[in-house]
């Protein structure tokens, strides 16, 4: 068996991952000698970019849904906490596998079943990319309109989106180290600007009582706001492996998890609470958060708000989304031989048209609500199943076997049944189906939502249902690590000894 090492074209120690240079590694296993990241970097990577309009809008929606300040505050707090716990479930995996979360998911779902994770994460990455590009473009045109009276029409918006996509593409092309350093720089700046939001809008703040609830009554609307808040940290779960794969396998999983959890929770929570606080000053415009915050902000805050909230943090998040999509595409059979940065450039062109279609030609808020509902109902059970598998195998993986899809004729530990773990797929499907039965949105109402007085429990039920079915199914079939095929590393060792 020749060239078993995934990414053998780049020898150990020869991969490039420097600030300002194009990263040469893809989804191949990162050699130990190249794993120079520290666990604390997960904090800065997932804290810094949260203070962008595309992420903050998830907090402003709590006010837009009709909640008062304190109800919105607690919905955001509870949602952020629970969503961050789901994020925590997949945080320790990538340092053990040396690759991203989508490829790592093959341990639970099978080497072919990993494509389920690819589909879910592509949906998330492209969805957020669209949101972030659109809100950055809005920030530009509304700020320039306030300063110079320029147009806010479709032409100006289209030009602004094109500019944002080009800048975003540069970050995604450069890759891991450049993105990590950028997020590190944003961390301190984001804390300062985030706190300035409270100062800038304090004179106009009022703890509005709410009452005009989007879903008719308080609790269904409160849970919708909590679900929206939870979706933000959950949406980052598939991305954590992009950065964790450069952390040494010897790093403590508890330390890795603690830094990741702290970064995602504090970043999402503070950004969304700040957005909700500001939105009380323009509650009637809260659905159009970018326009509302730009037009009602005091003059002294317009420039830092544009540079950090509208551009730097938003573009950093968008670049991370595009990087994730391009990195994962390298594991698709038709794109095995295409370089990551080539894929990133191609995706940028596609997203420009997609952004126009989804947010300009149609209703942005309706599409956003649909996106959140589908994303959280499908991603939560996927992440919970991966987390349970990690606990069952006690963090022990066979990294080479995860790359069997790239080795002709190879199977390995994670082959299961034809490359798919049926137990995991059934569990995920059961979780999604159960979750949709409890869904309560303006677009879709599940048949069981009336049993909980209209409260949307879709993502909670999806995660619980999928996790329970997977745990029971795995224990019953007694296949905690996977199938009966020998590890590829053992096969390689036998071949070497046989030719010696």
Positions of PLM-derived features:
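Transmembrane alpha-helical segments of multi-pass small-molecule transport proteins
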Residues: 118, 146-174, 188-199, 229-240, ...
């Amino acid at each position: 068996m020749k060239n078993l090492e995934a990414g053998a074209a780049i020898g150990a120690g020869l991969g490039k991952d420097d600030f300002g240079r194009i990263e040469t590694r893809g989804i191949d296993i990162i050699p130990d000698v190249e794993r120079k990241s520290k666990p604390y970097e997960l904090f800065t990577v997932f804290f810094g970019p949260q203070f962008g309009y595309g992420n903050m809008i998830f907090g402003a929606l709590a006010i837009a849904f009709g909640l008062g300040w304190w109800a919105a505050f607690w919905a955001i707090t509870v949602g952020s906490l629970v969503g961050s716990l789901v994020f925590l479930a997949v945080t320790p995996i990538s340092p053990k596998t040396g690759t991203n979360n989508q490829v790592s998911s093959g341990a639970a779902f099978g080497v072919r079943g990993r494509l389920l994770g690819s589909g879910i994460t592509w949906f998330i990455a492209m969805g957020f990319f669209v949101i972030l590009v659109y809100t950055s473009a809005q920030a530009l045109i509304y700020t320039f309109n306030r300063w110079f009276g320029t147009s806010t029409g479709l032409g100006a918006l289209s030009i602004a989106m094109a500019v944002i996509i080009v800048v975003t593409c540069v970050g995604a092309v450069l890759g891991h180290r450049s993105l990590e350093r950028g997020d590190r720089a944003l961390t301190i700046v984001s804390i300062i600007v985030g706190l300035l939001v409270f100062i800038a809008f304090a004179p106009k703040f009022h703890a509005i009582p709410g009452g005009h609830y989007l879903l008719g009554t308080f609790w269904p609307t409160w849970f919708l706001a909590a679900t929206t808040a939870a979706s933000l940290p959950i949406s980052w779960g598939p991305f954590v492996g992009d950065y964790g794969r450069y952390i040494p396998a010897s790093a403590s999983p508890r330390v890795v998890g603690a830094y990741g959890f702290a970064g995602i929770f504090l970043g999402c929570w503070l950004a969304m609470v700040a957005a909700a606080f500001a939105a009380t000053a323009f509650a009637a415009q809260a659905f159009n958060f970018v326009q509302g915050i730009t037009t009602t902000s005091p003059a002294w805050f317009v420039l830092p708000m544009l540079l950090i909230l509208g551009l730097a943090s938003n573009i950093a998040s968008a670049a991370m989304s595009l990087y994730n999509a391009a990195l994962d595409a390298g594991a698709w059979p038709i794109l095995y031989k295409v370089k990551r940065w080539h894929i990133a450039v191609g995706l940028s062109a596609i997203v420009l048209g997609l952004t126009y279609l989804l947010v300009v030609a149609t209703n942005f808020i309706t599409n956003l609500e649909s996106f959140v509902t589908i994303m959280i109902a499908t991603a939560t059970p996927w992440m919970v199943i991966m987390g349970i598998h990690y606990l069952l195998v006690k963090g022990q993986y066979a990294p080479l076997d995860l790359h069997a899809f790239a080795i002709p004729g190879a199977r390995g530990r994670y082959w299961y049944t034809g490359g798919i773990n049926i137990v995991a797929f059934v569990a995920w499907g059961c979780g999604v189906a159960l979750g949709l039965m409890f869904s309560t949105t303006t677009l879709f109402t599940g048949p069981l939502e009336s049993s909980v007085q209209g409260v949307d429990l879709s993502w909670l039920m999806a995660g619980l249902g999928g996790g329970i079915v997977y745990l029971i199914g795995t224990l019953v079939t007694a296949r905690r690590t996977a199938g009966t095929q020998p590890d590829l590393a053992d096969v390689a060792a036998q071949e070497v000894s046989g030719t010696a």
